[in-house]
């Protein structure tokens, strides 16, 4: 019952912070950035997929992608998402704040569970749990709601490691027996939490393993003999591997997506490994210790491109780092001190910080929630010890730092060369109005901090000596003030997030995305076709239910990355093409372009030159609709081909010619060219000047369309097409190449050929034939077998008497 009460307190506190903004928007939570164009569309698309039974492949996710691979980072492993599937799809956008509140309630419970093992009192653990669950990190990442699964369950993973250490270290004690149930439970808990955390979010799991490794070495290994430590590490590794094996059925679906993601190729190198490239970054890190956090993507003071999307915040409501400063002064030797200082060094050394993000060159502070839990602990420890002197010193340091940051906002700046006038003030900040909110909310907390560290009650009387001996400064007043500051932290960030968006933006988002669907004249006449909405309507197609070529999602199929990388534009977090890429649009079966006329009033389709071959065919839901008159249905053949190397040379010389060549030539690697080159009438090795003309391009589009499949249908397992060919040829399909695909022609197994760098083709004989593509995540069967084997081993260990697995005697 205690944890149930805590859970509902956390839920209600977050809902109290977000409710005014829901009411302001007319009953729905509208925020900014990725929340509007990723979190909500992703939930709706995934919810629809689950309800319709599409668990493996989704044709509405970019050019098509694996659900388990592409959404594993966002929601596929989230228990909160699967809970949302119990509700009707129409409810999902309105229930998003409720689902978020469940994560806050969970974080409050799990952090309390770990902190209770470290504090003297339950009240102290509760105060620390509020600091963690409602920290600045939590607030600034409301825009990234999939981060909160990791923060919600991390304290349990830390608790599981503590219990596993205790179990292993006492496994050989005679007083504990050879293999007591408590020892087994300790190991079992760590195995299960390792499995769960790897499924919940594999990206955060990597950072958690690193942090737990540092935590173990500092807290436990430093106090043990080397031989004992090595034995424990080996057993923990075995338990961890067993946990990963238990989740193999899930993780195998991620491997292909990870292996082809171009973002993994960007590593820190050279001086960037030891010093941040932008001088404002260390100052921004310092600011994150003391003040309400910046919005992700909208910095105020010390902002830069490097930290813009970093999720940078180490802020504890009310206390900031005053408790940590006090603890460092009071305790010269403790594992908490060593771990705090280690985290501080890691934060300011780029290569160490990057280790938590797979050494990516982009700056991320997305591991800061883990030291925040430690900051919460040491703050509570100081309060329980009633260390007024050191706490007051810490409070003064926080106040001094906040004053200095405020003064930095007034630093003089020299205007740009184009601007007139001399030195100006208050111009150093990119978003000064956001800094005002940060400063005001932080300033409101400072006197409350002084009230707590001075042990003042609301009545003006100090606690009794008995209460002070029991709880120190963790009084009811202190707890109430901390809860108030937790509310202010979330509300302050939410206020800033609502400040940067126009009032009409929420209404347009609600009307155009959720309540209506553009009716496209002629859509559905083709068996399969894609549309493309402009940049103001990112990912709207997911909600509307139209296949698209425009998608903002970081972890799509590796074939999509390879395709965009090969043809020129490249891809990082989204798939998008300039208006000049008409050839790429054609082979992707893009049929319609939608321009949001309600938003793009000045910078519109016509003024940007438009798309050659497109014409306006109607208006709907605030969109101008343009149809591609030279649309090529999916599944078609080519007469000519070009090798990847030749295309790369052409791309370097003339990007326009290279783009239009995509409609004339199928691009093959050397191996495929050698095997299937004889099927084509010719191979192009240089630019054909004719392909640069519009007439020639349109002619090639008509040729490709004339060879398109006569029928095409998608299913839960893939797609089926019928094609009539006048000769044996490769039939090209604009879906990403993945190892999980298998193809059959008239029921006979056929080889899938990688074409156009990352898409697919299959060899079909002359005549009319049925082509079937079936998708099953590569390695899924093997992953299931590994998971079942791990489950058997785990059950055997837990149920059978005296198993060998994990016994310390085995390692003697």
PLM regions: where:
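Membrane-interface helix-loop-helix junctions at transmembrane boundaries of multi-pass membrane enzymes
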Residues: 224-234, 323-347
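Periplasmic/ER-lumenal interhelical loops and adjacent helix-loop junctions
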Residues: 37-46, 65, 72, 79, ...
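Active-site-proximal, structured, solvent-exposed surfaces of multi-pass membrane proteins
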Residues: 673-812
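Membrane-interface micro-motifs in multi-pass membrane enzymes
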Residues: 69-74, 93-104, 131-158, 165, ...
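Membrane-embedded helix bundles of polyisoprenyl
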Residues: 10-14, 100, 105-117, 123-168, ...
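Extracytoplasmic/lumenal acceptor-recognition loop(s) of multi-pass membrane glycoenzymes
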Residues: 70, 194, 482-508, 519-590, ...
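Active-site lumenal/periplasmic loops and adjacent helix-entry segments of GT-C-fold
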Residues: 20-118, 123-155, 172, 196, ...
